């Protein structure tokens, strides 16, 4: 099955699955689930525990330390949830000494699939959650680590909702910063008779965020106009050459003096990690840790 066919199959599956649960709300988090080695095992667990918190996260009694004064807020990708995206990284950051938080936003309350709603609306919910974290922890700023849409959506919060004053670092893992053509699927679908109506009417109704992440969408044009970054915020992007969702993979990259762009294969040429599993890749995880704590950064490779 070629990349376009794989993308089309995935789109049909996700659309068919989500169409029965279209109301968008801020989903609650429950007790922490176990650590997981991959998105596959995490998703299997999340089927029965869709509101599980990633290990070590969502402890509102946590107080930041002098070594790690900014809490870390994790932001998941389209159709994922906090647990299945972050059941690996969350525990790592907690053991490093961070206060870690991971909300479920932009999906049906208690549902498996989150981050499908209108992105500006979800960004507003995200901002409210950041305020909750700041109030609980006493911190003045947070750091954000996001995957896919979750690495791009906070930029709306930073640019339009006052978030730049409350964020120190934004790390994006395969973020959809400049959109995706889904290996040509977007153009292929829209070129079909009725394809535009299907994309905007059916997919857009079930998953507004999906349409908003198309290359050239009005949402992304607005987000990226006037530059990619905000003053006072440090940005790190980790992309993978084998990304099959954010395509071309270079559309993840940002430009600006406070940006550091990475590619997994520059650290391990044979790293085949793709879009979905990048949050579990050991190189990506270390690059996140480096971005959050540059004073103790070290260079990962194929083995470490």
Q: Language model features by range: what are they?
A:
Residues 72, 100-102, 170, 235-237, ...:
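Conserved beta-strand scaffold positions in the cores of enzyme catalytic domains, especially
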Residues 192-193, 230-304:
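C-terminal catalytic-base region of ester-bond hydrolases, centering on the histidine
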């Amino acid at each position: 099955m070629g990349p376009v066919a794989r993308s089309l199959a995935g789109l049909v599956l996700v659309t068919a699955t989500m169409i029965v649960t279209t109301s968008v709300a801020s989903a609650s988090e429950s007790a922490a689930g176990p650590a997981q080695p991959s998105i596959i095992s995490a998703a299997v667990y999340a089927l029965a525990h869709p509101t599980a918190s990633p290990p070590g996260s969502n402890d509102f009694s946590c107080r930041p330390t002098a070594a790690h004064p900014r809490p870390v807020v994790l932001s998941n990708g389209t159709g994922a949830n906090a647990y299945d995206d972050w059941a690996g990284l969350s525990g790592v950051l907690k053991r490093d000494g961070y206060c870690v938080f991971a909300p479920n936003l932009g999906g049906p309350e208690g549902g498996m699939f989150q981050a499908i709603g209108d992105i500006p609306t979800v960004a507003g919910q995200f901002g409210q959650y950041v305020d909750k974290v700041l109030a609980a922890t006493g911190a003045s700023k947070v750091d954000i680590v996001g995957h896919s849409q979750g690495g791009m959506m906070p930029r709306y919060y930073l640019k339009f909702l006052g978030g730049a004053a409350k964020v120190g670092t934004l790390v994006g893992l395969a973020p959809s910063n400049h959109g995706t053509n889904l290996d040509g699927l977007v153009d292929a679908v829209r070129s079909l008779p009725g394809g535009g109506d299907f994309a905007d009417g059916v997919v857009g109704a079930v998953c507004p965020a999906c349409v908003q992440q198309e290359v050239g969408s009005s949402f992304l044009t607005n987000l990226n106009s006037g530059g990619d970054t905000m003053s006072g915020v440090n940005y790190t992007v980790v992309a993978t050459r084998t990304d099959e969702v954010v395509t071309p993979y270079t559309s993840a990259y940002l430009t600006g003096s406070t940006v550091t762009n990475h590619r997994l294969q520059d650290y391990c040429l044979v790293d085949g990690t793709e879009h979905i599993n990048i949050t579990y890749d050991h190189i990506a995880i270390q690059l996140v840790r480096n971005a959050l704590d540059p004073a103790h950064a070290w260079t990962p490779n194929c083995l470490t």
